């Protein structure tokens, strides 16, 4: 027993030596050891020896890399931690999200949780937020080559005429997704096929990518003209990049959240007036964004979306397009109407990072962990919750700017000004 336990550290040190000499690659460690957790340890030991840095905090994690390797991570060395706070309760009156919710926000930005919290209070005191998903469809846009514009146009018509055949192709790939629409777009002799899919409770990028690949194969094998797929993603999807097409046609969940904030709540909680909030929104979010050439006509959608994405295991890179959208305000008598529109909110409750234990717990906190009943309902509920949280964040920031409170809030909460004792 003693000799075998002594052999194990020696073997790990031997593997560190092999990494250092270049005779073993990091990508082969799991196969060499048969254990992803031990492979992570060896990588840390190697990196500590190489750089002199201590990775003891990175090593401190509840994650089991045996469960994650090959699904969520390659070459693991540990994990990072981000503080999580909650804002709420936030009352939501949506088609799927109904009730009072505490919103988990993973962030290192002081004042963000407090900002959403005050906005949530104002919304809840005014009866709650209404939320609705207008459209739901994840997109992928393969790019096909043809020899001429005439062939490109013929291909586009051929594809549109065979949408039922293509739906059958997709049905053979997944039981959770369905091909909804095809939008052909022609430039010269090239054809983009913007394919839109329903994806159930998954965000769906893996599903739509595999389905799009099968569609391209079907076209190449069955089209009676000259066409070749040259890129499975032709950037008209558009994934992880700001793009007007996502704002116009939507990608993921096209969702709106709105509320009418009572005049006395604006005065007593937000410390300003509906007129001042409306003025800031029109001049800052609308005119200022237009003058800057921004794709986003809002104050800080990305703050809230990034914090919830990290907390709930969404694809953090998709904050780029998910945070594009519009904040709209109107003065209605003594009250303030405010809405946020997010045309391309890309979220899911199964797959990807939603499998991680801490993220799954926070999805459960919101009542959306795993698949919904009926299928797709949990992802729609999560979209309504996120949009309502964004509404709370926008309402508070516009109010803080209108009341001249923004700098003071960051001095107090973002620079260590708030003390427990």
From Swiss-Prot:
Gene3D superfamilies: 3-hydroxy-3-methylglutaryl-coenzyme A Reductase, Chain A, domain 2, HMGR, N-terminal domain, Hydroxymethylglutaryl-CoA reductase, class I/II, NAD/NADP-binding domain. Pfam families: HMG-CoA_red (PF00368). One of its GO terms (biological process) is coenzyme A metabolic process. Keywords: Isoprene biosynthesis, NADP, Oxidoreductase. It catalyses: (R)-mevalonate + 2 NADP(+) + CoA = (3S)-3-hydroxy-3-methylglutaryl-CoA + 2 NADPH + 2 H(+). Its EC number is 1.1.1.34. The keyword tRNA-binding does not apply. One of its GO terms (molecular function) is hydroxymethylglutaryl-CoA reductase (NADPH) activity. Pathway: Metabolic intermediate biosynthesis; (R)-mevalonate biosynthesis; (R)-mevalonate from acetyl-CoA: step 3/3. The active site is at residues 109, 240, 315, 410. Belongs to the HMG-CoA reductase family. Converts HMG-CoA to mevalonate. This is 3-hydroxy-3-methylglutaryl-coenzyme A reductase. It comes from Aeropyrum pernix (strain ATCC 700893 / DSM 11879 / JCM 9820 / NBRC 100138 / K1).
